[in-house]
A protein has these predicted regions:
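Domain-level recognition of nuclease-like catalytic cores that cleave nucleotide substrates
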Residues: 173-207
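Residue-level signature for tetratricopeptide repeat
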Residues: 27-30, 34, 75
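Acidic-basic catalytic patches of nuclease active cores, encompassing PD-(D/E)XK
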Residues: 79-117
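Alpha-helical junction/boundary sensor with strong preference for TPR arrays
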Residues: 8, 12-15, 55-62
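Mg2+/Mn2+-dependent nuclease catalytic core
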Residues: 145-174
Length: 207
């Protein structure tokens, strides 16, 4: 994606036709999402600013571009929140973010491709959306600093499962996904700095 973005930038530098503008816009949107998955806030902000400048020079603004810009702004805000929590947030939020990072790394090592992180639909969210070959995998991450009092899975109650089901349905409709999909849960017991956190991957978990 980085190479595609650079190629679109070079084209746009010498060509301001609708085709070049469209190529620049959509590769920038995809690049911003890629940087968000990698937690690269500074670089994502630069792409977002470039998109804002591009939008300011458009002769006509399409509804799809406007919607994409709103989603990019939401992605940036979530990145800022994650960074703020990681820097000075309360312990339970720091542990939760650490668990999500661990889960992303765990999935990548298993060959999964991370598509989205912290995807939101209204007040419902999906922690990780990944591809396992051609199968879309929606992942909920549950992290506890200790299992002495409560298992991580205990937080996945009936209401949470219902919200996840709605969010997954919304995402599949929005992205027009017709291929296979499943819902996984990754449970983690440990805290930042742990030498050997306990990680369990529950595949095809019933909602």
């Amino acid at each position: 994606m980085e190479q595609a973005y650079e190629a679109a930038r070079q084209l746009y530098a010498v060509d301001k036709t609708d085709y070049a503008v469209s190529a620049m816009f959509w590769t920038a949107v995809d690049r911003l999402k890629e940087l968000a998955v990698q937690d690269q806030l500074h670089e994502a902000l630069q792409i977002h600013l470039a998109l804002q400048r591009l939008m300011a020079h458009l002769n006509t603004e399409s509804p799809m571009m406007s919607e994409a810009m709103m989603k990019c702004a939401a992605v940036i805000e979530r990145l800022k929140v994650r960074k703020s929590i990681a820097d000075n947030g309360p312990l339970h939020l720091i542990v939760g973010l650490w668990g999500e990072e661990l889960a992303v790394d765990f999935l990548r090592k298993k060959g999964y491709r991370i598509i989205e992180r912290d995807w939101h639909s209204s007040h419902k969210d999906i922690d990780i959306i990944a591809l396992d070959r051609s199968c879309y995998v929606f992942v909920e991450v549950k992290t506890r600093s200790s299992d002495a009092f409560e298992e991580p899975l205990s937080a996945l109650d009936k209401k949470k499962c219902k919200n996840l089901s709605h969010a997954i349905t919304h995402y599949r409709c929005y992205r027009k996904i017709l291929s296979d999909w499943r819902f996984d849960v990754i449970t983690i017991v440990g805290r930042p700095g742990s030498d050997s956190p306990q990680i369990e991957h529950l595949m095809d978990f019933a909602l």
